């Protein structure tokens, strides 16, 4: 048995896929975060409750940690919740881990490519300056900075995932929303900014990368997790139209247009691939087909 893997946010979208990868490696997975029990392996706690969190982490004594618990939606309306969850919650977790009798072998913190903001470079690598454009990105940038306080006590690696999607993601995110509209064969969809480009990965690729970073990731390093290819919203609409056999009318709703929208996010995964080996590449069309079929039963 490889030992115990602690996954915060296990009950969330990404947590399920990460747990599957870790279990395949022989880890016993234990989850921490808000939400109900999952097969008896999920312990409910608000990471902002430092005392209770510390007690649970001391009981678990994890060998490896994947920290996913966070407010993950850029347009989340409660600013105080964004900062308290993403910064204070992370700080409490790191303090609890540092106090453990047995030092964790690796701690992976999931940040976000949104920290790069509107960088004026065609492809973003880890050397690019961070210039966050919204509260969510600022909170993730701050999380990265505060993690440096524990660099002598904990072997921390930071991932900066670009956009990713898959079966089970909330309809508040763009691609699940679009898939849902096409699967229900709705005639039109309301969107915000459509003149944007995003680097999309499959959640299964991201989960695989996270699991491998626990073994190969170098402490103190930051790694982009991305496909290296960006798509426009129009590209995605065309893929879904082909899958569903019809085109949908797009209406731009000003209420959905975000201030300080990042126009283009395209990442370089060279550092990641050099560290963990060849990535588990899944074409975006295949991901959309997987999501579409999961909803339609086809």
Where are these regions (language model features)?
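C-terminal substrate-binding subdomain of Rossmann-fold SDR/epimerase-dehydratase oxidoreductases
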Residues: 184-298
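Rossmann-fold cofactor-recognition segment
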Residues: 36-49
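NAD(P)-dependent short-chain dehydrogenase/reductase
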Residues: 121-122, 145-199, 203-212, 237-241
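NAD(P)H-binding glycine-rich loop region in Rossmannoid oxidoreductase-like domains
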Residues: 47-85
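N-terminal Rossmann NAD(P)H-binding glycine-rich loop of SDR-like oxidoreductase domains
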Residues: 5-25
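SDR active-site strand-loop-helix element
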Residues: 8, 32, 65-69, 107-113, ...
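Active-site helix of classical SDR
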Residues: 135-142
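Conserved Rossmann-fold NAD(P)-dependent oxidoreductase catalytic core, especially the SDR/UDP-sugar
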Residues: 91-135
């Amino acid at each position: 048995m490889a030992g115990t893997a602690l996954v915060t946010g296990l009950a969330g979208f990404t947590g399920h896929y990460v747990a599957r990868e870790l279990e395949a490696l022989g880890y016993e997975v234990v989850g921490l975060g808000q939400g109900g029990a999952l097969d008896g392996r999920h312990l409910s706690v608000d990471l902002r409750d430092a005392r209770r969190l510390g007690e649970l982490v001391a009981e678990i004594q994890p060998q490896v940690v994947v920290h996913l618990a966070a407010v993950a939606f850029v347009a989340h309306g409660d600013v105080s919740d964004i900062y308290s969850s993403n910064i204070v919650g992370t700080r409490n977790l790191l303090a609890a881990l540092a106090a453990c009798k047995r030092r964790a072998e690796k701690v992976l913190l999931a940040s976000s490519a949104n920290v790069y903001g509107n960088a004026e470079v065609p492809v973003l690598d880890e050397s690019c300056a961070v210039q966050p454009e919204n509260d969510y990105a600022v909170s993730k940038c701050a999380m990265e900075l505060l993690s440096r306080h524990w660099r002598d006590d904990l072997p921390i690696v930071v991932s900066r995932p670009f956009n990713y999607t898959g079966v089970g993601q909330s309809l508040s995110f763009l691609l699940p929303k679009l898939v849902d509209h096409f699967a229900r064969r709705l005639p039109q969809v309301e969107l915000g900014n459509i003149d944007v480009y995003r680097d999309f990965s499959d959640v299964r690729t991201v989960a695989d990368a996270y699991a491998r970073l626990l073994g190969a990731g170098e402490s103190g390093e930051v790694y982009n997790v991305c496909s290296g290819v960006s798509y426009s919203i129009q590209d995605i609409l065309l893929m879904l139209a082909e899958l569903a056999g019809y085109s949908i009318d797009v209406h731009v709703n000003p209420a959905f247009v975000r201030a300080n929208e990042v126009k283009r996010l395209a990442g370089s995964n060279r550092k990641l691939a050099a560290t963990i080996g060849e990535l588990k590449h899944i074409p975006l069309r295949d991901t959309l087909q997987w999501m579409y079929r999961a909803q339609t039963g086809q």
